[in-house]
Amino acid sequence: MANKIIESSDVHLFYGKNEALKGINMDFAENEITALIGPSGCGKSTYLRCLNRMNDLIDSATVTGKFLLNGQDIYAPEMDTVKLRKEVGMVFQQPNPFPFSIYDNVVYGLRLSGVKDHRVLDEAVETSLKQAAVWDDVKDKLHESALSLSGGQQQRVCIARVLAVKPKVILMDEPTSALDPISSTKIENMLLELRQQYTIIMVTHNMHQASRISDKTAFFLQGELIEYAPTKKIFLNPTEKETEDYISGRFG
C-alpha cells in the first residue's frame, strides 16, 4: 500500500444553507492518479477545491470535517494558504497563462517565493517545460507572450508553472476539456509520466480519459461519494447501481 499523502474525513461543505458535500471520506496515495467523475453539479469540483482551500475565496462557503496533508491539518488556523497552494497546485479547465512571456509565466511562483538567482530560474524553466512536454515547442521563444501559443501549449505552460514550485500534489479541474484531441492525448501522456513524481487528482467528464490514465476513480452524485475504488473495478465491476448507470450512460 502506497503512503497516504492526503486524508479527508466527514467533509461537509455548505454554500449558505445549501449542502454541496455530504460527509465525504477519501484518502489519496502518493504517486497515483485519481479521477473524480459524476454529473455536473455533483460536488466533484467543489471537493477538489477543498484540497487547497480554493473554496476560501467564496464568501458563502463553509467547510467542516478534516483534511490532512502528510498528517498536517490543511484547515488549521495557522496554515499558510500561500504555502499550501504551492504544495497542492491547481490547473484549471481553461488555460489561464498570465499576459507575460512564457519564461515569466513559469517562474512566477518562484519569484513570489523570493528566488532571484537567474541560474536557478533558468534551470526551473527548462526542467518544468520539459516535464510538461512543451519545451521543444517553446524553447526558442521563451521571451514571447504565452498568449501567442495554441490552447494546448498554453495549458502545458500552465502545468509547467505549477511544477516549477515543486508541489507534492497536483489538482486538475477538467484540464483537457477545452482542448482538441491531439492536445488532450499529449497531456494524458504527460500525466502518466508525472505520476512517477507527483500525486494527481483530476476532475473529468471524459469516461475514456478516466479509464485510460487513472489508478483510482471516485464517483460523486448529489454531493455524496457513491463509490471509490481501483479504476478497473469501477468501470468493469462497480459495486453500486448508480455507478453502473452513470458509466453506462443511463444518466448524467
Swiss-Prot record:
Pfam families listed in its UniProt record: ABC_tran (PF00005)
UniProt keywords (A-Z) are: ATP-binding, Cell membrane, Membrane, Nucleotide-binding, Phosphate transport, Translocase, Transport
Q: What is its EC number?
A: 7.3.2.1
Q: Which organism is it from?
A: Latilactobacillus sakei subsp. sakei (strain 23K)
Quaternary structure? The complex is composed of two ATP-binding proteins (PstB), two transmembrane proteins (PstC and PstA) and a solute-binding protein (PstS).
What name is this protein filed under? Phosphate import ATP-binding protein PstB 2
Residue intervals passing through the bilayer: none
Q: What class of enzyme is it?
A: translocase
Q: Which GO terms describe its biological process?
A: phosphate ion transmembrane transport
Residues reported to bind ATP? 38-45
